[in-house]
């Protein structure tokens, strides 16, 4: 009899654990975030004006347009926000592994990425441009001029794909940060850098020896940024879209970008 009781208790315990695990796995990301009271956001803080570091109140602080959007999302959810910084090519991987709840880091919702992640409505649209040395603008007038030349891009970015598609005869060098790519250009290691337009403008304004080329880089669509989250995050996605719609209607996203851009220039002169 005791043996049977032990077996029944054992089965009951296994059933309870299985049921608990099933309930946990079936929870939407929104419920998981609200349960823990914190929204963990993956980003790469080297992409001004969307996310970058500056000194505030004596502390190294992550700021930028994406940061403000993430804060607005956390406010809507009624939770705290925690920013987890990493290299850009690890941002989406952290969402996929569950280490981060969302990723907002100038991420384009490509068809390939949409197979693995849920994405919010787009919150910012831009275009991709090519930065060269100012005294070389006359040398590089079309994509063919970069044949057998080196062009730098940020590893894992949509610009990496655009560069490879448009500059197929060039040597595309993938680097961890946009700043590294700019340094390679200034030192003569590469002849061009492919960047998102707002990012390129920031670097050109800070470096009088650089310029945005007139060369047009073709893409299937405009480079549009969205918030990434785990597949099946329907409830969270609805909340994020609500925040994005409100911010866009109020013109706040454009203000975030403008203010962050001004701050990035100010920070670079310190």
Give, region by region, the residue ranges found by the protein language model.
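Periplasmic-binding protein-like
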Residues: 125-132, 201-244, 261-270
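Short helix-initiation/N-cap motifs at beta->coil->alpha
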Residues: 65, 83-93, 138, 173-183, ...
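C-terminal motif of bacterial Sec signal peptides marking the signal peptidase cleavage site
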Residues: 18-22
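Extracytoplasmic small-molecule ligand-binding "clamshell" domains
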Residues: 28-106
């Amino acid at each position: 009899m005791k043996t049977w009781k032990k077996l029944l208790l054992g089965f009951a315990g296994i059933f309870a654990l299985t049921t608990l695990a099933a309930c946990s796995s079936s929870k939407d990301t929104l419920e998981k975030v609200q349960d823990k009271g914190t929204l963990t956001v993956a980003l790469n803080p080297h992409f001004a004006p969307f996310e970058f570091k500056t000194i505030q109140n004596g502390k190294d602080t992550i700021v930028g347009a994406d940061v403000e959007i993430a804060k607005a999302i956390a406010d809507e959810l009624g939770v705290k926000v925690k920013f987890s910084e990493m290299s850009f090519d690890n941002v989406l991987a952290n969402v996929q592994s569950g280490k981060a709840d969302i990723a907002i880091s100038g991420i384009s919702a490509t068809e390939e990425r949409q197979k693995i992640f849920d994405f919010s409505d787009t919150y910012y649209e831009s275009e991709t441009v090519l930065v060269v040395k100012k005294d070389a603008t006359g040398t590089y007038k079309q994509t063919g001029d970069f044949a057998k030349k080196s062009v730098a891009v940020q590893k894992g970015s949509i610009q990496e794909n655009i560069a490879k598609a448009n500059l197929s005869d060039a040597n595309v060098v993938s680097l961890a940060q946009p700043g590294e790519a700019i340094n390679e250009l200034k030192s003569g290691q590469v002849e061009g850098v492919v960047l998102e337009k707002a990012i390129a403008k920031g670097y050109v304004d800070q470096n009088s020896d650089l310029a945005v080329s007139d060369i047009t880089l073709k893409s299937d669509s405009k480079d549009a940024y969205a918030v990434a989250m785990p597949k099946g995050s329907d409830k969270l996605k609805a909340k994020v879209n609500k925040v994005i719609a409100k911010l866009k209607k109020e013109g706040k996203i454009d203000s975030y970008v403008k203010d962050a851009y001004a701050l990035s220039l100010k920070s670079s002169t310190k």
